[in-house]
């Protein structure tokens, strides 16, 4: 069985496309916090371990998604939780979020021993200019190096990529797709940039008069009415079409399919092949 758990609600980073601070900062100004200070709280390792123990012993849970926006951040906190999982003998398969610039060498083996089988990384874009414009600052060399050490410890990787950030053009989006294909993560998510209400990008879109969806369905990544942001160089329809073609390119890549069959087996390979046989219906794709 599977369950979610939380260890560190909130996020200390300021990526402008993200709306996570909308719920976590709610009411904090009344408590005296500055608007510029993002909300991020640590639950004690003992509390987290007690929750995980309860899930295992009472409910028979073996698969846990740590639903934090950023679990792998503070080495002392993460290492204490990982050490406790090992000491308590909790037989878990764990999925969690990380950033390429937060995974310290001291964490990797501890994460693997504790049962962390998947880490999801927000790589977002290959262009440092595009990333810097949305306050996502790291270089491609760090991306490659971090993923190598994580996968070297036996932890599988989900790469998350965004097409259509404000500085994107066809060339930079192709660079992002090329990086995704090169990294060949065990799974990948391809998103269009959306100005989600509550995000700094939403406020920027309002201020600059960028077109926004007329209904909540337009904010859905996979809906017929999905309407991403245009960029300084591309229409929303062009971004949407590129994203959908990038999905097909990645998941039909022979190198990726060979890796899936080798790591996960023929049944999973068949599921991936079946997935790419279905194209999303889009109203606004150019």
Task: Show which residues each predicted segment covers.
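Radical SAM enzyme core and accessory elements
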Residues: 200-207, 211-286
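Short glycine/threonine-rich loop-to-helix capping motif typified by GTGT followed
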Residues: 74-81, 171-173, 268-271
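Radical SAM [4Fe-4S] cluster-binding motif and immediate context
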Residues: 1-158, 178
């Amino acid at each position: 069985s599977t369950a979610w758990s939380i260890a560190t609600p909130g996020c200390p980073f300021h990526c402008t496309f993200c709306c996570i601070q909308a719920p976590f900062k709610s009411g904090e100004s009344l408590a005296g916090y500055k608007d510029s200070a993002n909300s991020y709280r640590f639950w004690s390792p003992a509390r987290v371990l007690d929750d995980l123990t309860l899930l295992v012993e009472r409910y028979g849970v073996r698969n846990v998604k740590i639903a934090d926006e950023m679990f792998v951040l503070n080495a002392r906190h993460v290492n204490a939780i990982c050490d406790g999982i090992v000491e308590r003998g909790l037989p878990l398969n764990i999925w969690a979020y990380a950033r390429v610039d937060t995974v310290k060498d001291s964490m990797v083996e501890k994460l693997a021993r504790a049962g962390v089988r998947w880490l999801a990384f927000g790589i977002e874009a290959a262009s440092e200019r595009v990333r810097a414009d949305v306050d996502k600052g790291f270089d491609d060399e760090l991306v490659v190096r971090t993923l190598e050490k994580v996968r070297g410890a036996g932890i599988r990787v989900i790469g998350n990529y965004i097409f259509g950030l404000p500085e994107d053009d066809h060339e930079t989006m192709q660079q992002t797709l090329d990086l995704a294909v090169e990294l060949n993560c065990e799974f990948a998510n391809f998103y269009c940039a959306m100005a989600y209400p509550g995000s700094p990008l939403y406020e920027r879109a309002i201020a600059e008069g960028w077109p926004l969806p007329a209904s909540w369905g337009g904010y859905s990544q996979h809906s017929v009415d999905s309407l991403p942001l245009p960029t300084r160089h591309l229409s929303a329809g062009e971004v949407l079409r590129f994203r959908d073609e990038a999905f097909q390119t990645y998941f039909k890549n022979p190198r990726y399919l060979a890796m899936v069959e080798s790591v996960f087996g023929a049944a999973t390979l068949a599921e991936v092949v079946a997935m790419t046989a279905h194209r999303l219906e889009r109203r606004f794709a150019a």
